[in-house]
């Protein structure tokens, strides 16, 4: 029971930090997000990379403990990335008739997310030797 309580706390603290980091990225990128949701795309692609990188390191090395993985992947990356923001921003682009931007956002998020995840895995394998 102690491990579960500790893991819940790790997820909560990681989620808090990830959410704050996402908000800071949104503030930082606000000047360039008037037409296209660059901030959400950025955090989702970076989060995909981090999830791939951290998960691969946790699986193939002893550099990341199970508790650290829970904190970083489930907590931080879970709070940092945001599917709900992606969905509302995508529907707003469609509603506003910005079909080209909507298509770029859709494919950039999906394909870019898979590429970022794979690059994270490759980077972790390279780092692990």
Curated annotation (Swiss-Prot):
GO terms for cellular component: plasma membrane. The keyword Cell inner membrane applies. It is found in: Cell inner membrane. Keywords: Cell inner membrane, Cell membrane, Ion channel, Ion transport, Membrane, Metal-binding, Sodium, Transmembrane, Transmembrane helix, Transport. This is Fluoride-specific ion channel FluC. Fluoride-specific ion channel. Important for reducing fluoride concentration in the cell, thus reducing its toxicity. Na(+) is not transported, but it plays an essential structural role and its presence is essential for fluoride channel function. Na(+) binds at residues 78, 81. InterPro entries: FluC. Pfam families: CRCB. One of its GO terms (molecular function) is fluoride channel activity. The chain crosses the membrane at residues 8-28, 34-54, 70-90, 102-122. Belongs to the fluoride channel Fluc/FEX (TC 1.A.43) family. It comes from Chlorobium chlorochromatii (strain CaD3). It catalyses: fluoride(in) = fluoride(out). It is a multi-pass membrane protein. GO terms for biological process: cellular detoxification of fluoride.
């Amino acid at each position: 029971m102690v491990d579960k309580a500790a893991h819940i706390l790790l997820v909560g603290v990681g989620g808090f930090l990830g959410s704050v980091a996402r908000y800071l990225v949104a503030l930082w990128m606000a000047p360039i997000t008037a037409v296209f949701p660059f901030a959400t795309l950025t955090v989702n692609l970076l989060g995909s990379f981090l999830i791939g990188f951290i998960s691969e390191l946790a699986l193939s090395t002893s550099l990341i403990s199970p508790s650290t993985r829970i904190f970083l992947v489930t907590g931080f990356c879970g709070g940092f990335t945001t599917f709900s923001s992606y969905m509302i921003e995508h529907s707003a682009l469609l509603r506003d008739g910005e079909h080209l931007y909507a298509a770029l956002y859709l494919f950039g998020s999906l394909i870019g997310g898979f590429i970022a995840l794979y690059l994270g895995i490759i980077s972790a394998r390279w780092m692990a030797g």
